[in-house]
Amino acid sequence: MRSAVIVTMLVVVALAALLTQGQDLKYQEREMVAELAQQIYRVAQAPWAGAVGPHKRNSELINSILGLPKVMNDAGRR
C-alpha cells in the first residue's frame, strides 16, 4: 500500500514537471510520455499486470513502423 502511494506521488510530480514543459514537446514526444505515464499507472494499480507488457493494435504497429524513417531523419538533423 505504501509503495503504491509513493509511486503515485512520483507519477504526479513527474507529470506536473512535464505539464510545465509540455508546450515544448512535439506530438510524438507527448504520445511517448502519455504511454509511459499509462504504464506507470498500471504498475501502481496492479504490479502483476505490468509484467505482461503493453499490447498494441495492428494499426498502431503499422503506423509506428511507417513513421520510423521520419523519426530517424528528424533525429539525424539534431
Swiss-Prot record:
GO terms for biological process: chemical synaptic transmission; response to light stimulus. InterPro entries: Pigment_DH. GO terms for cellular component: extracellular region; synapse. Pfam families: Pigment_DH (PF06324). The modification Alanine amide is found at A75. Expressed in eyestalk tissue and cerebral ganglia. Keywords: Amidation, Cleavage on pair of basic residues, Hormone, Neurotransmitter, Secreted, Signal. Residues 1-22 form the signal peptide. Its main location: secreted. It is found in: Secreted. GO terms for molecular function: hormone activity. Belongs to the arthropod PDH family. The pigment-dispersing hormone causes the migration of the distal retinal pigment into the proximal end of the pigment chromatophore cells and thus decreases the amount of light entering the retinulas. May also function as a neurotransmitter and/or neuromodulator. This is Pigment-dispersing hormone peptides. It comes from Carcinus maenas.
